[in-house]
């Protein structure tokens, strides 16, 4: 920084101290300017909070949001183009219904109904994904751009204006001790910054119909989603009612127990409900503990030496996305990195990946 720049910073700091501590009066801005500044501040707060609440509305599960953010970050680091999407609750419910519907089979009324409902839930999840994309493009992104560009630019102008005001007030207070030309230049710069800040705030407030248009796009996307959701659920309701009518019109099958077989109670080995029992092996003194010379070892995964960062799995973890590391309860995992407060990166049997911190107990922590 040049000598002139250092002097200017000293002037501003000196004036600020005299106003805050000494109670000195600074140049007052007009009421219209203050009113615009207040409206811009309220607009900035409104846009910031509405953005956060809209994301919560579209993706209500905070754990899933955090996991998705982490996976997207990892995908960018690895140069992967396709990022995993948010796991819609309708899709998870649909997969559950379809899985159990297939297990029950086609002869089960409930199984067939679960398959119908599961397919409809998956369609609802697809419609919800479309809502997410539509709202992001036409509502979230424009508001985020407003925050990052227009509002940020206004804050820059206001900060610059405050700095020039302090410089002008300091020099005005020392009038007669500094050249008149220097005081005149300070006043011109202050007036110039005030005009620039005023113009940018006026433009933002006068064009707020753009935000109304973006809000309208949000409502249109919601309406389209709910129309499609109602159509899908109406179709599902008709299918289930038709299944109920068909089931009630079919004759009921009566249960006919199979005839009991005659039980032969002559042999004690077959006295266990008619089923033959396996003969118990005889234990002799010569053979009963002979095998204890070589204890039986259960197969286990290779364990890393405990002098390096590692952890023990408390529960089974099934990976749902690329890059995650699956393991079973009791596995010992080598720790290589901590992604954030919720996720570790580690290795098991030569495989590397990410896994949640809450699923493991740290044995040897990572170096700080």
UniProtKB/Swiss-Prot annotation:
Residue positions, PTM Phosphotyrosine: 315
Nucleus as UniProt keyword: no
Region feature Membrane-binding amphipathic helix, mapped onto this chain: 1-21
Record keywords, A-Z: Cell junction, Cell projection, Coiled coil, Cytoplasm, Endocytosis, Endosome, Lipid-binding, Membrane, Phosphoprotein, SH3 domain
The protein's name: Endophilin-A2
Residue ranges annotated for the SH3 domain, each copy included: 306-365
InterPro entries membership: AH/BAR_dom_sf, BAR_dom, Endophilin_A_SH3, Endophilin_SH3RF, SH3-like_dom_sf, SH3_domain
Compartments, as annotated in UniProt: Cytoplasm; Early endosome membrane; Cell projection, Podosome
Domain BAR: 18-249
Membrane topology field: Peripheral membrane protein
One matching Pfam family: SH3_1
Gene this chain is encoded by: SH3GL1
Stretches the record annotates as Interaction with ARC: 218-254
Region of interest (Required for dimerization upon membrane association), residue spans: 60-87
GO biological process: endocytosis
Family assignment from sequence similarity: Belongs to the endophilin family.
Domain notes: An N-terminal amphipathic helix, the BAR domain and a second amphipathic helix inserted into helix 1 of the BAR domain (N-BAR domain) induce membrane curvature and bind curved membranes.
Modified residue annotations for Phosphothreonine: 298
GO molecular function, one term: lipid binding
Stretches with biased composition (Basic and acidic residues): 245-263
UniProt cross-references to PANTHER family, sorted A to Z: ENDOPHILIN-A2 (PTHR14167:SF63), SH3 DOMAIN-CONTAINING (PTHR14167)
Residue numbers of Phosphoserine PTMs: 288, 292
Chain's role: Implicated in endocytosis. May recruit other proteins to membranes with high curvature.
